Amino acid sequence: ECFIYPHNLGEGKLYGAQENDFNYYKACALSGLGRKEEATELFLAASIGNSQPAAAMYYNDQKPDKIFYQGLALRKLEREEEARGRFNNLISYGEKHLYDVFKMDYFAVSLPDLQIWEDDMNKKNRIHCNYLMALGHLGLGNNEKAMKYFDIAAEMDNNHQGVQIHQKMI
């Protein structure tokens, strides 16, 4: 049911929104039930999409965990080199952009979700970059490093849903 958007929400799925995580978890469930062919199809679906991280400051930007799930799906498909590439992309982006100074760049509906509250966008960027590095290290099995970056992100935003969900994977 996670693939179906209720009509009464007033807005459906955003155009181009990826569902790598949904596909990955459904594939894992099907695999566990012995339905290998169906699982493989969903792992393939989970493995595709934009593999280059971005700032993800706007509500319609691809979230970094989608790339993380691409990597996990590729690993299930025994495409380890490609999987590691996804995880390394997350780490590289986080390291490169950790101290970037954020410059507002929006048009019409892409205004950042919390701009009305005047958030510190540089802080949000640092949280985002630490989260990216945590996901990358988690995917590579570097659990100590992953926990370090999850902890930094959580210290800056203890309500970060991605951190709360993925930190429990360690």
Predicted stretch roles:
Residues 22, 55-56, 100, 129, ...:
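TPR alpha-solenoid repeat register
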Residues 4-11, 45-55, 91-92, 154-155:
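Amphipathic alpha-helical segments of tetratricopeptide repeats
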Residues 19, 53, 80, 97, ...:
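Residue-level recognition of tetratricopeptide repeat
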